[in-house]
Amino acid sequence: LVDIIAALEPTFGGINLEDIKAPECFYVEKKLRERCNIPVFHDDQHGTAIITAAAVLNGLRLIKKDIAEVTLVCSGAGAAAIACLDLLVALGMKRENITVCDSKGVIYQTREDRERMDESKVRYAIADNGQRVLGDAVTGKDIFLGLSGANVLKPEMLQTMAENPMVFALANPQPEIWPPEAKAVRPDVIIGTGRSDFPNQVNNVSVSYTHLRAHETSLH
């Protein structure tokens, strides 16, 4: 795949990678960036990360919370989730304030399958604090970031979150929790989804291709 895409370099000014699963997407993007002299961008990772970071920063401004102090739980540990977390950390969120859950539950340092985890997951493994499932991890958190599956955030879980919680339920087509359901149990929630039929859409379609700008060209 890397060889095929690299062979297209003379024809295009930039390449967007789409729908490559983790961990293969990390390898493909890295190798192409090493070989190509044009921008190579994996939209599922970085497009999602850019729009999610914008949503988080705007939400924090509204509720007057500091990115360095808030806590976050992430449901999902694929390419998009890891890219979002990496960008949020780069913007000032403390890694120790982040808890990540995959399909097996909370990712912690002594979990029995740690040796088989992708490096990207291991980076976000927390010290064992007894939390094992999403329902444990979400308690008291300021932010829920969902890049996993439909209806995984139950109303009773949302009720345990901190004051003025932010929920980004980005699974498509069905989010981790529906906005009306979230508002019913937590009127103080700020909620965004990946869908265009609800307010506060958080979707990489808002970023796609606007991040690529030509600085110079050899065409005349």
Question: What label would you give each PLM region?
Answer:
Residues 1-68:
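Glycine/serine-rich phosphate-binding loop and adjoining beta1-alpha1 elements at the start
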Residues 25, 48-53, 79-86, 151-156, ...:
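Short glycine/serine/threonine-rich phosphate/pyrophosphate-binding segments
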Residues 41-50, 73-77, 196-198:
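Active-site nucleophile and cofactor-binding loops and adjacent substrate-binding regions
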Residues 51-138:
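Glycine-rich phosphate/diphosphate-binding loop of Rossmann-like nucleotide-binding domains
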Residues 112-158, 162-170, 176:
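Rossmann-like NAD(P)-binding element
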Residues 171-202:
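Rossmann-fold NAD(P)-binding glycine/threonine-rich loop
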Residues 210-219:
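Conserved small/polar residues in nucleotide/adenosyl-binding loops
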